[in-house]
Amino acid sequence: KELGINALHIKLRATGGNKTKTPGPGAQSALRALARSGMKIGRIEDVTPIPTDSTPRKGGRRGRRL
């Protein structure tokens, strides 16, 4: 705010690829903190990379065995 910035467009990004596609717990609280500090939030955009032809996920053919 002291820099003269009073409005934001937010790009939200998770790990993506062949890992998790949901943002972590800090994303929502960071967004809420920005809104509470008086920033005007214009647009929230999800820019998580989504695979088109992914490498196999870790865990192997039979998955994670507990």
UniProtKB/Swiss-Prot annotation:
Belongs to the universal ribosomal protein uS11 family. Residues 46-66 are annotated as: Disordered. InterPro entries: Ribosomal_uS11 (IPR001971), Ribosomal_uS11_CS (IPR018102), Ribosomal_uS11_sf (IPR036967). GO terms for cellular component: ribonucleoprotein complex; ribosome. This is Small ribosomal subunit protein uS11. One of its GO terms (molecular function) is structural constituent of ribosome. Keywords: Ribonucleoprotein, Ribosomal protein. PROSITE patterns: RIBOSOMAL_S11. One of its GO terms (biological process) is translation. Signal peptide: none annotated. Transmembrane segments: none annotated.
